[in-house]
Regions:
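Membrane-embedded, hydrophobic transmembrane alpha-helices
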Residues: 1-69
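Active-site lumenal/periplasmic loops and adjacent helix-entry segments of GT-C-fold
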Residues: 85-233
Length: 497
């Protein structure tokens, strides 16, 4: 609550809001995609699990300094501008990857749930982030979808900022600068690996060529907000469970509900969750009950995802990528070791650097080299947890060494280059709607003048095909047993080119 010295924030209340944020899409999914008996049973499990998790959360309060009272808007404004820049709310021409989302929203708003296309394919995708806004657009009006999606995303970003403040209350600004603007980390990684930062031939703009930045991990985290939010919340809950014993039930419930947001994120977090459960679990009936509920949610979502997993398109993998896959596997035991040492709070800077440098090296190599959607999602929770520890170490080390403080500030400034460039790029594309954007992949070659500002009102261009990552044949337990039955339908006019 506000006071002359600042204000306090309750981790218990923040964890509850996070759990409700992750859980709301499940209520919509159960009510609209599943047969009534299964919807009722799973809905009761969801409500019971959330109630037990909330009830067992420790009462922990974090005191914020008084400067938070008047600098909060300064802190959140760049993040909100970045969200608008990538396409959230459709204020600007969206980032090219974000156009995939518009096909997904278009189908969710216009077609009956669960979605089956005329060729027999089903829409199989982690739809947790998309469901609240799509449901609002379906029930009310398509334009409402855009408005709800914007504020739904802004609320998620606000929770992220509050969690960062609760984790680093005295140094929130620098923490967010390192954590959220991690483009500086990737710039260093590309320099170490000898990879290019710019491609001068990819994007012709108004008068000549404006370079496009090859920052793959930034793109993936920025333009896939559902995946990023689920990974951040899950990593944060695990971090506070290990440090503060916040609530293991909250962690388990958050893990079970993250499947609908991104099943790859949930699967990648499983080794870390097992490690935290093994070291912090107590014999309570509520823990067993919440654990069973989270496993049920995970099994149902994996039944939903299984047809897509079986039919993922494959591509040849180089030896370099195989080596990076192995590095990502090594990232997990390194992270477990870091988690195991968190409680020691060793502040001798060179000892902390010995532990941080190998982890940061793995982070750089895996983040830069693994330009693969699924692998990035699998490593998202370890990525955020490693970043938590790196931020904590840097903020404690820089107090004792001036040169380390200078290096930290340079890293933050480098990180700001990346989102600033992307925001400039999207504003530029919005100012010149006649421009064409080309890419070797035909999925991204389209005339921007043919796309309306509010994409959901009209169809996307016919050459913007649906991603194969959204489609799967209607087979397996989910479509045959759990999902609602829909009558066969003809192709809708809105789906025609």
């Amino acid at each position: 609550m506000p006071s002359s010295r600042g204000f306090d924030i309750s981790l218990r209340r923040l964890a509850r809001r996070t759990l409700l944020y992750l859980g709301l899409p499940h209520a919509i999914f159960f009510a609209t995609w599943l047969k009534l008996p299964f919807a009722v049973v799973l809905g009761l499990c969801l409500v019971g699990g959330i109630y037990l998790a909330m009830k067992t959360t420790q009462r922990i309060s974090i005191s914020f300094p008084s400067k938070w009272n008047y600098r909060f808007l300064i802190l959140v404004s760049p993040l909100f501008a970045l969200a608008i820049g990538i396409g959230m709310g459709q204020w600007l021409t969206p980032h090219m990857h974000y156009l995939w989302h518009n096909h997904l929203w278009q189908d969710l708003v216009r077609l009956p749930w669960p979605i089956r296309y005329e060729d027999g394919q089903m829409l199989v995708h982690p739809v947790g982030y998309f469901l609240p806004s799509a449901w609002a657009g379906k029930v009310l009006h398509p334009i409402i979808q855009v408005i709800v999606e914007f504020w739904w995303g802004i609320y998620g970003i606000s929770l992220v900022i509050l969690w960062m403040g609760a984790t680093f209350p005295q140094k929130t600004y620098r923490a967010i600068g390192i954590f959220m603007l991690f483009g500086g980390v990737e710039i260093i990684g590309r320099w170490l690996l000898g990879q290019p930062l710019w491609d001068l031939s990819w994007e012709p703009l108004a008068e000549g060529q404006v370079p496009s930045m090859f920052l793959s991990v930034y793109d993936r985290f920025a333009v896939w907000p559902g995946q990023s939010l689920a990974a951040f919340f899950l990593a944060t809950l695990l971090y506070h469970q290990w440090k503060d014993r916040l609530s293991l039930e909250i962690c388990l419930m958050g893990w079970g509900m993250s499947f609908l947001w991104s099943w790859w994120v949930a699967l990648g977090a499983l080794p870390l969750l097992i490690f935290v459960v093994w070291h912090t679990a107590t014999h309570k009936w509520s823990l067993w009950a919440v654990g069973i509920v989270s496993c049920i949610l995970g099994i149902v979502m994996m039944a939903f995802a299984w047809p897509q997993i079986q039919n993922l398109p494959t591509a040849p993998i180089s030896y370099f990528q195989v080596a990076l896959w192995l590095m990502l596997l090594l990232l997990l035991p390194v992270q477990l070791l870091i988690l195991h040492k968190i409680q020691l709070k060793e502040n001798i800077w060179w000892i902390r650097m010995i532990g941080i440098v190998p982890a940061a090296g793995l982070l750089l190599t895996s983040a830069v080299g693994l330009n693969i959607e699924i692998v990035i999602a699998l490593g998202a929770v370890p990525f955020f947890l490693l970043t938590y520890e790196i931020v904590d170490a840097l903020l404690s080390i820089q107090q004792s060494k001036m040169w380390l403080q200078v290096c930290l500030n340079v890293l933050v400034l480098m990180g700001m280059v990346v989102p600033a460039y992307h925001l400039y790029r999207q504003i530029h594309l919005t100012r010149y709607p006649h421009l064409q954007v080309y890419d070797p992949n035909p999925l991204f070659s389209l005339d921007l003048s043919q796309i309306p500002v509010i994409y959901i009102i009209k169809d996307l261009p016919p050459d913007m095909d649906r991603s194969p990552y959204y489609l799967a044949p209607p087979q397996g337990i989910f479509s045959e047993l759990l999902a609602k039955d829909l009558p066969a339908r003809k192709k809708m006019d809105s789906e025609k080119p």
